[in-house]
Amino acid sequence: YLQRIRKADGVMFSGGDQSRLTRIFGNTEFLEIIKQRYWNEEFVVAGTSAGAMAMSEIMIKGGSSTEALLRGSVKIGHGFGLISGVIIDSHFVIRGRFGRLMEAVVTHPKTVGIGLGEDTGVLITEGHMIETIGSNLVVIVDGHGVDYTNINDIEPGKPVAIAGMMMHVLAKGNVFNINSRVFFKNMDSLEKKELQSETQR
C-alpha cells in the first residue's frame, strides 16, 4: 500500500470516527508520505465527516452539542497535521455544533474554526486559502480577536463566557484567507485585490 500511495494522484479519508483514523494512521510512514506529497506536490487529500475533521493539527475528538460551552465538554486531540492553524467540525449546522466549535477555538484562540454544513466542503490551497463548494454553508469561527474569556478561570462544567469572537458565513464560491482572516466574495475578487497590491508596489 505504500507503493500505491506513492503513485496515486490523491487519497480520500471516509467518515466514521476521527479518533480511530488518527489511531490507525498517526505516526505512520503511510501518513508521512501523504503529508510530504501534499506539501510538496500537487497531491489531493480529501476527507468527509470524520475524515475532514482529522485533517487539522488540532482535532475535535468529541463532545455533545447540548453540553458545549461548558468548560471541558469538548474533547481535543491531535489530528493528521496536514493543515495548521485550523479546527474543523462537520455536520455543523444540522447538528447545532456552533457552541462546540466556539469552545474548541476559544481554548486555542490563534486558530480558525471551520464548520462544514451538509453537502458542502472547502477547497484549501496553499495551506491557507479556503474556497467554499457545495449547496450549503461553511461557518468560520475566528478567535483571533477574543478580548475576554473566563475559560481558564472556571471549573469544569461551568459556563464559558467569550467576548470579541468573530464569525463569517460562507456560501458557494466565497473565499477566506486563514492567515490574514480576510473574506473575499470569490476568487476573482481575490485576484483583483492581489493585482492591485502588485500595481501599488
Predicted regions and their residues:
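N-terminal beta1-alpha1 cap of cysteine-dependent amidohydrolase-like domains
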Residues: 1-14, 175-178
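Catalytic-core regions built around general acid/base machinery
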Residues: 4-7, 29-42
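Catalytic nucleophile loop
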Residues: 14-15, 38-59
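Short, active-site-adjacent cap segments at secondary-structure transitions
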Residues: 18-19, 52-55, 121-123
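Glycine/threonine-rich flexible loop motifs
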Residues: 18-28
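Glycine/Thr-rich phosphate-binding loops of Rossmann-like dinucleotide-binding domains
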Residues: 21-22, 56, 63
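Glycine-rich, phosphate-binding/catalytic loops in enzymes
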Residues: 27-31, 62-64
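C-terminal and late-domain segments of enzyme folds
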Residues: 59-201
